[in-house]
Amino acid sequence: MTGQFHDAIPGIDVVLLDIGGTLVEQAVPGTPVGALVPRPLPGVVETLRALAPHHRLGAVTDTAVMDEAAVRALLAQIGVDDLLGAVVTSCDVGAEKPDPRGVLEACRRLGVAPERALLIGDRAVDRDAAANAGAAFVAVDRGLADALARARASRRGAFADAAARVTPCDADAFAASQARHAQLTKPAGSLGRLEDLGHRLAAITGRCPPPIPTRPVVGVFAGDHGVARAGVTPWPQDITAAMVANFARRGAAINAVARQVGATVQVVDVGVARDLGLIDGILHHKVRPGTDDLALGPAMTTADARAALDVGAEVATSLVADGHDLLVTGEMGIGNTTPSAALIAALTHTAPAAVTGRGTGIDDGMLAHKTKIVTNAVARTDTYLDPVSVLAEVGGLEIAALAGFIVAGAANNVPVVVDGVIACAALLVADALVANIADHCIAGHRSSEPGASIALGCLGLAPLLDLELRLGEGTGACLAIPIVQTAARVLHEMATFDELEQ
């Protein structure tokens, strides 16, 4: 995304920026100062000029050999020096990030308290310097304009914004699809559920024929669960972080399936317990390092749950703005079938034993233990009326983010293909928060986890595939992408009987 930034970030007076990797291309280490040629990253100059009327700007950068004057001379070459009210280098303050002195000095020069400042950077040390100074931080994963948009959305409440923009599916487009199918060169109803899918796509997008999705993307949200330590899974929690790294290296099942069907994979750290640094290809939106053990009490606070909902909504909105026209849900989190079962039981008022499955293949003893934990956790939600309170009590960060992802897809009239039991739990949360949100979704497949079928039944969704999958990651939903594309293509490219007579 290289578009300009057009609005202020609520609660922020000063925006501080790292330089190398954030404003300009990172120079090769050891390059002599005299040989440095600043090359602005795409959209940076335009974005800074659009931002300047709304916020005071400054830069905080690590360099062992350049003082403020030398750095400003380089920035003047790309026309942004005049926009920066303060430029602080590690050479000037005698400390590199994550030491907060550079951030604090920039805030002092600009006359603002650190809690009213936002630092934007591309490295883990930038994030840690902001935290140590008490400032906000956003990673420049997808360009400066995108980082600013995410910062603004998170301050305003991206989920609430998306929820307010959701409208009912288009009944006229649905009827137009039915009418067109009746005119196509085939017996009425002979394409079976493919016709139903075409009608649904028309209603979701508000267009008949519906657009043929050409840029599908799988949003894989990763988070850890305190309940994983309670004996509900044979896998160690560290597997979550290892799999996130595997996704980044494109070596996981979802990467292979996505390549086959022409989809992009976007991985988001919303709550992995381990510090992942700033791995390339990962969006770093960690709300907290994993949830607490839901066997002992609430998995998280309602503030955590709402923050994760915002993350999902922000990511979906950004992906749609980048031109993606089909959203697919994916996830990773050791132990996450336990909170999913708890959410499904609580939100569908189904007996926990009926929705709790074997997850990664646990034995009978572990299943009985897992079911007891789910039963006790669900009992704590009996008096809750607010779905966010239920989500906070027994849910997960990646599940919350998926719920936000789904709602933002609906807000943008983009179809969302949901995956297995984790995604079904997220969709139940989304549907409890925004009426009839499931109308905007397509069930990609039926997971072999028992809770998935119960959730789909309550949501009124019939899955496109039933391959006895239980991996997650978005694999089943991703496999359904060609079917979704075909349903739209049929409405575009089949001739009508009237056209045959011409």
PLM segments and residue spans:
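Asp-based phosphoryl-transfer active-site loop
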Residues: 8-28, 327
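Metal-dependent phosphoesterase signature
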Residues: 25-42
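N-terminal loops that bind phosphate or other acidic moieties
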Residues: 152-502
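Asp-based, Mg2+/Mn2+-dependent phosphohydrolase catalytic module
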Residues: 1-17, 38, 45, 49-50, ...
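Short amphipathic alpha-helical segments
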Residues: 28-30, 70-73, 130-133, 232-233, ...
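Conserved Rossmann-like nucleotide-cofactor binding loop
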Residues: 22, 125, 273
